[in-house]
Amino acid sequence: AILLVSPGSVGWLLDDLESTPVVQPAKLKNADAIVILGGGARKYAPEFGGQTVNRLTLERLRYGARLAHRSGLPVLVTGGAPSDSQPEGALMKTVLEEDFRVPVKWVESRSLDTRENAAFSAEILLPAGVRRIVLVTHAAHMRRSVEAFEHAGFEVIPAPTAFFGDRGASDDALPGLPGMNAAFAGSYAAHEWLGLLAYRVSR
């Protein structure tokens, strides 16, 4: 367990996952659309009238909105939900349009994982002639996401966001010691490595 909370170990786990560079503005000109992946929802958000996106999804939406404002590209949001919840895609559309003033052209709301994000987005976008996409997700999630979307038939321009920076420890009160941020980053990185392995084995 200490492997997942030690800042040095977290850095080792994240090095390859977060190796994709920040997207350059010139690359946006070559894209057909922006695709933003959901990262979860908050079921209890009474201040927002019921449910809303969680922090991970909000980080992705914020950066996706920034890219949309800069480029004018149309946006697809993708994310489903268990049967007792609102689909992430619908929640993401609400946040983008009401809070960031970014219109959402397409909503994919059936997917429950990254592979389905890609497959169901392809069902919407490829028939519309959209093949070259700017893909927005967490930097540590980008490697697995690119593989899934390329396998689904897209040409992907990665647009990573929400880097863990100093390996998840920079916000801790005592950065040299294991802390909550490092623990979260380590858990996230381990999840991504396991997801990559499972994806490649089952492909």
Feature roles, as predicted:
Residues L3-G186:
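A structural signal for short, hydrophobic/glycine-enriched beta-strand patches
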Residues I2-L3, L197:
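Hydrophobic residues within the alpha-helical transmembrane core of Major Facilitator Superfamily
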Residues W12, D16-L17, G186-R203:
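A transmembrane-helix-recognition feature enriched in membrane-embedded lipid enzymes
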